[in-house]
A protein has these predicted regions:
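Non-heme di-metal
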Residues: 1-290
């Protein structure tokens, strides 16, 4: 039985692919509505999106036994690099002095330590949900028509990527059962508790290479490592109401995935403990003499 998801996902993503020349209204640009401060945030997001490159290298390394998922990552990588490119193209046309240098882009390409693939999958699923909301809020903050359109466009891509990751999470549960449930619930509790943390919980803000600590997050390698918190708190105003939307979306999807309703991170954590106990019981039973 062929359970590969890549052929269908490729067709689905291809059918809604946007063209950088034809689908972005470059001729609608209004220079009076773009400040240097705003252009700097566009530059930082362009560099951040470039980090799909080391993430792809990590995915391919840690999923070398999963050709289906690895093939999907080729599409994900293409679209994420396109996000970086369209933001850089915007700057090239309208704020050329802000275009990231090759050195600035290269700075965010470094090796990530190996990590459990199922936990990484869930982490990036949550990351896509968060980025979708960040970009939607950014589109509301900007008044310049072209960049508003760009953020709206790439936010929809992030939502579709999250949907694709969810398909692979369902597949993993079919294949490994409670092992996958435990991994997804563990990261889900962390990501749904984001309001209790000092820093934004997104893959680009997490430490991924112990030997390079503390410069082992994507954000720590940007020209302004503190830009993200300022962008979220002082510029696009990603406040508690928006944070609540992210958490609700994560819990909603996990409720569907696990076929059990979760309204809070605490409820999800109780479920996680149940799954861990089942795994421990199964492991203990398997070690009993026949």
């Amino acid at each position: 039985m062929n359970t590969m998801l890549y052929p269908e996902l490729y067709k689905s993503l291809e059918s809604v692919r946007w063209d950088m020349e034809k689908d972005i209204p470059w001729d609608k640009f209004d220079s009076a509505l773009l400040t240097d401060e705003q252009a700097k945030t566009i530059k930082m997001n362009a560099i951040t999106e470039w980090s799909a490159l080391p993430a792809t290298e990590m995915f391919l390394r840690d999923n070398h036994n999963d050709s289906d998922f690895s093939a999907f990552i080729s599409v994900w990588f293409f679209e994420e690099q396109k996000h970086s490119l369209v933001l850089m193209e915007y700057l090239r046309r309208f704020k050329p002095e802000m275009v990231p240098t090759e050195e600035e882009l290269d700075a965010v390409r470094f090796e990530f330590d190996p990590a459990p693939p199922l936990e990484t999958l869930m982490l990036h699923f949550c990351g896509e949900i968060r980025l979708n909301h960040w970009y939607r809020r950014a589109a509301e903050w900007h008044t310049e028509p072209v960049i508003k359109h760009i953020y709206e466009t790439i936010s929809r891509d992030e939502a579709r990527h999250g949907g694709a990751y969810l398909r692979y999470m369902k597949k993993a549960m079919t294949q490994t059962g409670d092992i996958a449930r435990a991994a997804f619930a563990k990261i889900g509790v962390l990501m749904a508790s984001a309001r209790r943390t000092e820093k934004p919980l997104h893959p680009t803000n997490l430490h991924v290479n112990q030997a390079l600590f503390p410069r082992d997050t994507i954000q720590s390698r940007l020209p302004d490592p503190d830009w993200l918190e300022h962008w979220l708190d002082e510029q696009i105003r990603f406040d508690d109401s928006w944070e609540k939307k992210v958490v609700e979306r994560i819990l909603h999807n996990l409720s569907i995935l696990f076929e059990r309703s979760f309204a809070t991170a605490q409820e999800l954590n109780r479920y996680r403990k149940e799954v861990v106990l089942r795994l421990q019981a199964a492991q203990g039973a398997s070690q009993l003499p026949a």
